[in-house]
Amino acid sequence: MMDAEKGDAMHTAAVVGLGYVGLPLVIEFGKRFRAIGFDISEDKVASCQKGTDPSHELADEEMRAAVHAEYSSDPAVLAEADFILVAVPTPVDEAHRPDLSPLIGASQTIGRHMKKGVTVVYESTVYPGATEEECIPVLERESGMRWKRDFFVGYSPERINPGDREHMLTNVIKVVAGDTPATLEKVAAFYEMVVQPGVFRCSSIKAAEACKVIENTQRDLNIALMNELAIIFDKIGLDTTEVLKAAGTKWNFLKFKPGLVGGHCIGVDPYYLTHKADMLGYHPQVIIAGRRINDGMGKFIAEQTVKQMIACGSYVKGAKVNVLGLTFKENCADLRNSKVMDIIRELQSYSIEVFVHEPEASAAEALHEYGVRLLPWEELPRADAIVAAVAHRRFLDLEIEDLTKKIVKGGAFIDVKAMHDASALRAAGIRVWRL
């Protein structure tokens, strides 16, 4: 039944959530058999029905390749699915506590409509134990069915990396787990139809959940170390980029870089792990310290910008600063939890006028989410300083002459990701600071 050539027609898969994680699942399974993409956002559904990815990660040609894909905002379609994959956001609230409301809401909707014998697979990032402690009871309550008798549950943490065309759903090993050995094999075979390198089987759902949160916690902590080193080197008067390049010549030096840590994964997932630890009476110190450092980098960069402007002789109050980039990372349109906003707000607290250019993201979304009006490159003023906040490819392609047209002579250039030629900028009379 799992054979891609013999039995695909017997399957109907449904994916709940048509974001960065869910839509690629619909597309890949939709190339082989009926795959239903469900989302409560009618706008997302309408965009997908027209053959356009709302997040602009997938090209229209890729969308069209999924000849068996369907899209709906009617939850009744979930009753037709043999497999239901859950790919909804799992954010944190303002106090950095896990917000499971999207996941609970999705589980309620699924429970009300799923058929007997269905396998529900969660992909959303959660703390170890959340699927069995929070989601399964909701499925039982809403459906009136019994777990492991009438329906089964698996877990396979998403590994989608927005803006990354190298590491995709189909070429990255998928971690899988199931509530029974039979479910595990069923889930493994299901994903093996689309994931070329295959799957890694975990012995429990909890182990698979833990796997995901530590992947991002490890990265968060490594970046936090680089950020702390950058702060120290700045005080010493050293260029962090040069020091890291030198250290990188050793075979076992891990090549992480300092920078802003935002988005819906790296800056969020550690809080899910620390929440679980707190529930068990253990209060993590290293993980929280890393989060504190990374969350403070926007303020630090803004402060350095002001110091560099003063060193240039600029009068700070009423000064103009151009910020290049607003998304949480390079080469993607995702504005969620962007730490560039920390820089912008801190600069504005000095009565600095901030202008933002972001070529990848939606201007309407930036205005709605943050109250920020995005400007085309041509409309940016000649400012007292430029903050190159996000390393988009389009910014890397800019010539020194392009940059100097948008900054006063003798102004300050703040290169957060060290992506531009500092020597050439200095030769053009620009003061350069980089993280």
Stretches with model-predicted labels:
Residues M2-L435:
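Structural/interface elements that position substrates and couple domains in central-metabolism enzymes
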